[in-house]
A protein has these predicted regions:
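Compositionally biased low-complexity segments at domain edges in trafficked proteins
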Residues: 1-15, 19, 439-463
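Short beta-strand elements
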Residues: 423-442
Length: 463
C-alpha cells in the first residue's frame, strides 16, 4: 500500500445496477440503460430566476414515499474505473456539445453559484478538449457536487467542490489524461496531472488573458484598492513556484514514483507544476501552438483508450515532429538540471553596406540546454525575431547576425516561456515599473524591475 498515488486499472465494460431509496438522485460513469435516475423530477428551469424556481419547486414537489426504492442500471463501456454519487438534495441541469450529453448535478444549497454557470463551463471545457486533443469517445460527461472542496475525476464523471471554471477544466482534462489516456498514476503522475494543469492554464490564459482568471467574478478584485492592482501572469506564478524549489536544494526528479517523493510539496511540484512548465517549454520549442497541438492529437489518436507511459508519449512526439527530443525530456524528467542562460556581451557595428552586424554573447550558467528565441528591438521601431539553435552541450557561444536598422536592445526568451532561474541577465534592457505599495499587493513579474513607493509620515515630539 502507498498513501501517495491514485489509480491504474484494465479497460473493460461495467454494467452496474443500483437499488437505492427513491428520494435519492443518482449520477454515475456510463449511461442509463434501465430505470429512472430521478433527474426529470428535479430539473431546474433555467429560463427563470433560480430562487423563484426553488420557491415554485418546493411548493409543488411531491416527495417519494420514504419506503419506496428505485432501480437504475448504468452501462459504461471501455473504461478502467467506475464511480457514482447520490444525494437527496441534488438538482439537475442538462446540455449538449455536439453528440455528447452534458449532465450537472448539484446541491440545492449551492444552486445560486452553480445554476447555468457550471453547465456553460462544462460545455466549454469539453469543447476545448475536443478542439485541442481529439474527439471525446464517450456518449456523456457529468459534473457533480461534492461535500469537500477540490475535485476528483473518474471516467465520464467528475466530482467538484465548487463552481470554479479552472477546477471544471482541470477535472475534465483528467477525463482525457488518466481516463482516456490511461497512465499509471503511481509511477507516472506527471502524465495526467502535468498535462491537465498545463491545458487548464492555457485555456484560462486564452480566455481571460495572461493573469488566467475572470476578474469580474472575483470579489477581491471588485473592491478598492485591489481592483486597481496590476495582475501577474499565471505562467510567471507557476515559474516562481518551481524556481523556489529548484533553488532550495530539495528538488527531485519528475519521473520519481509518487510514493518516493519526500513530502507533499515535492509531489505537488513534480506531478503538477514542473511537468506543466515542461510542456509549456515544449510548445516554445516547437514555436507553434498549431504544431504542439497537432502532435498532441497524434499522441491522443494513437493511444486513446489504451495505457500510456513516458516512452509512449515521447515516441509519439518524435514520430509526429520528426525531431530528436530525448535531450529535452531526459533533462526535465530524470535530472534536476536547471536552466539559466544570460547575455554575456552585446556588440553592434555598422558595416560598409549600411547594415548593422551584431555579435551576441550567450552564456549558459545552468546545466540544462535549450534553443533560444532572440528578439532585437531596432531604431526604426521594428522588432527582429530569430532563433539561436547552437545550444546542445554548449555553455557559451557567440550568435552573429545582420540587421537593416540600428539595434537598441536584445532579449533572449522575450516572452519568458522557459524556467530560466534568473531572467535579469536575459535582456540588455530590463523594463521598469513603478507602482504604489498597496497593502496586500503581490506583483512579481519575471521580466521587470518593480519599484514600489509609499508615503511615510514622521513627527517630532515637541518640548
Amino acid at each position: 500500500f502507498h498513501a501517495e498515488g491514485e489509480f491504474y486499472g484494465e479497460f473493460g465494460d461495467f454494467n452496474v445496477k443500483f437499488d437505492i431509496p427513491s428520494s435519492f438522485i443518482i449520477g454515475a460513469s456510463g449511461t442509463v440503460i434501465d430505470g429512472d435516475p430521478g433527474w426529470n423530477s428535479v430539473t431546474v428551469d433555467t429560463s427563470i430566476d433560480f430562487n423563484k424556481w426553488v420557491e415554485n419547486f418546493e411548493s409543488t414537489y411531491i416527495a417519494p414515499d420514504p419506503s419506496s426504492r428505485r432501480n437504475i442500471t448504468f452501462l459504461a463501456e471501455n473504461v478502467h474505473d467506475f464511480a457514482w454519487v447520490a444525494s437527496k438534495d441534488f438538482l439537475y441541469e442538462k446540455g449538449k456539445h455536439n453528440d455528447i450529453d452534458v449532465h450537472v448535478l448539484y446541491d440545492k444549497g449551492r444552486g445560486e453559484d452553480w445554476t447555468k454557470v457550471v453547465l456553460d463551463r462544462s460545455i466549454r471545457a469539453i469543447a476545448w478538449l475536443e478542439d485541442k486533443f481529439g474527439k471525446y469517445p464517450y456518449p456523456q460527461i457529468t459534473t457533480t457536487d461534492r461535500v469537500k472542496n477540490g475535485g476528483m475525476e473518474y471516467p465520464m464523471l467528475v466530482m467538484n467542490g465548487r463552481a470554479s471554471e479552472g477546477l471544471i477544466v482541470h477535472e475534465y482534462g483528467h477525463v482525457y489524461f488518466y481516463g482516456i489516456l490511461a497512465n499509471n498514476e503511481l509511477d507516472d503522475a506527471w502524465l495526467d496531472e502535468g498535462f491537465t494543469t498545463t491545458q487548464t492554464s492555457h485555456y484560462l490564459m486564452t480566455r481571460y488573458g495572461d493573469h488566467g482568471f475572470d476578474k469580474s467574478e472575483n470579489d477581491y478584485y471588485q473592491k478598492f484598492p485591489s481592483k486597481n492592482f496590476p495582475l501577474e501572469s499565471d505562467l510567471h506564478q507557476d515559474q516562481w513556484s518551481a524556481i523556489r524549489l529548484m533553488r532550495s536544494g530539495h528538488d527531485e526528479n519528475i519521473s520519481r514514483p509518487s510514493y518516493l517523493f519526500k513530502n507533499g510539496t515535492a509531489y505537488s511540484r513534480n506531478a503538477y507544476t514542473k511537468p506543466s512548465l515542461m510542456l509549456t517549454e515544449l510548445r516554445y520549442l516547437f514555436d507553434s501552438d498549431s504544431l504542439y497541438y497537432a502532435a498532441m492529437k497524434y499522441y491522443y489518436q494513437k493511444w486513446k483508450l489504451k495505457h500510456v507511459n513516458e516512452e509512449r508519449f515521447i515516441d509519439a512526439m518524435e514520430e509526429f515532429t520528426q525531431q530528436d527530443l530525448n535531450w529535452f525530456f531526459d533533462s526535465w524528467l530524470h535530472t534536476t538540471n536547471h536552466l539559466d542562460y544570460g547575455i554575456s556581451s552585446f556588440k553592434k557595428i555598422k558595416n560598409n553596406n549600411n547594415k548593422w552586424s551584431v555579435d551576441l554573447g550567450i552564456k549558459n550558467y545552468g546545466s540544462r540546454f535549450m534553443p533560444l528565441k532572440i528578439e532585437t528591438k531596432l531604431a526604426d521601431g521594428s522588432i527582429d525575431v530569430r532563433w539561436w539553435e547552437n545550444h546542445k552541450w554548449r555553455f557559451s557561444d557567440t550568435f552573429s547576425y545582420e540587421l537593416d536598422s540600428k539595434p537598441l536592445s536584445v532579449a533572449i526568451d522575450p516572452d519568458v516561456q522557459t524556467v530560466d532561474l534568473d531572467y535579469r541577465n536575459n535582456t540588455t534592457k530590463m523594463r521598469n515599473t513603478i507602482i504604489f505599495d498597496w497593502p496586500g499587493l503581490y506583483y512579481n513579474p519575471r521580466d521587470q524591475y518593480v519599484y514600489r513607493w509609499s508615503p511615510q509620515f514622521y513627527y517630532n515630539e515637541s518640548k
